[in-house]
Regions:
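Eukaryotic intrinsically disordered, low-complexity regulatory linkers and tails enriched in Ser/Thr/Pro
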Residues: 1-81
């Protein structure tokens, strides 16, 4: 991948140097929202906000698997039962 455009289409990161992608939950207007964020060039950046946590995780995983690390294996820690 050569660039990421933020959800609101205000910013495009060309060839970003990404160290971390993650999801955090945040209450906005009394509603729980899930933000997909990235550490790009050592700065925290909001990429998008979603009302469903599973959608946020799916977006984050799509960015990792399809765009940045291609064939690199990623281990996901199992859910607590």
């Amino acid at each position: 991948m050569y660039s990421i455009q933020t959800q609101n289409k205000d910013t495009i990161y060309y060839n970003p140097n990404i160290k971390k992608l993650y999801v955090i939950d945040k209450t906005i207007d009394n509603k729980l929202q899930y933000e997909v964020r990235a550490t790009i060039d050592n700065d925290d950046r909001l990429l998008g906000r979603y009302s469903d946590k599973s959608v946020a995780h799916e977006i984050m995983n799509d960015l990792i698997s399809d765009s940045f690390w291609g064939e690199t294996a990623m281990y996901s820690m199992p859910e607590d039962k």
